[in-house]
Amino acid sequence: MADLTGKERVMKMFKKEPIDRMPCFSGQGTVTVQAIEKMETQFAKIHNDAKLMAGAAVTSARMWGLDGLAIPYDMAIVAEAMGRGVSLYDSAEGIIYPTVPNKWKDLDEIDIPGNYMSQGRMPVVDKAFDILKNDAPDLAIGAWVLGPFTLAGQIMELDILLKGLKKKKDQIEAFLGQVTQVTIDLCEHYESLGVDFITVREMGSGTDLLSPRMWKTLIQPNLTKVFDAISIPSVNHICGSTDMIIEMMHECGADALSVDQKNDVAETRKKLGDDVLIFGNFDPYGTLTTMEDIGEVENVIKQCVDNGVDAVWPGCDIWPDVKQENMEAYVRTVKEYGIKASPAVGRI
């Protein structure tokens, strides 16, 4: 039998169909400095140029032997399109992600424009997806969006948002309803562009910040609406502490759950059973950038597999300045150790 392409491997996994080995990919940023250097460009330039954005994704995926890729790379794109501006740090030599300089400071200021989808760098991302479909038909192409609560924290000051939960609860809930519709519209837009899967990153909603009770009333209903609207494979990603909300995360209706190193994945597997796709859950910076011993990298990845994940995902974006030998060890270990079946996905 012919080898599966990366795209075939990932898409079969989402359907829980038998595959030859565990896929090695992420629904979050996997661009690395080695790829950027090969392209003879800079990290600061790949956020505002469709060819460079797509090229960095494909070059990184092919350089390391990944089965998929995902764009964009920064969290400021939607806020910028809504008129909040962006700091791109164009002249920076190192790794600095774009940020939002002019967040709304009061609920009464908020005015989401109707044409944001065509503003700022949104068309750049659209063009990058078109390029990826032509240049990487053999790879699973992922888009990611921020969850409603996390997106809200990009377009207005988070501390004002949190304070408003007590003093202006109805107004905050109405605002989150607006932002939920934005998230849904973005997902439907990326679907229309032909992406293979979507990761919804409600990163700022772990129990480090919100109580499980607040998560159930403030986060879960809106995430459920988002996943109800997605008709292609979807991933519910939350970093930080998620042990106490993992069942509620599952109830939101995504095809897979993604968690970071703070989650007790072995216990999560027991709670949810073997039929749920679980991705995770290594510390990307600690494992790929600072870890000195290749054997330790291999052990971290093997532990993820042994704990019951169906795909070994980093807990967040891979920090671009990875050590080559660590990245190689990560990919190699997933492919070799992931030959055995995972709880939700059998092997051919």
Language-model region placement:
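Active-site loop segments of alpha/beta catalytic cores
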Residues: 1-34, 39, 43, 56, ...
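Active-site loop/lid in soluble adenylation, ligation, and acyl-transfer enzymes
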Residues: 38, 60-74
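Short, structured active-site "lid" loops
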Residues: 44-54, 62-64
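Active-site nucleophile and cofactor-binding loops and adjacent substrate-binding regions
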Residues: 47-48, 73, 239
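Intrinsic-disorder/low-complexity, polar/charged segments
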Residues: 48-51, 102-109, 119, 292-293
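A contiguous, low-structure linker/loop signature
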Residues: 72-115, 138
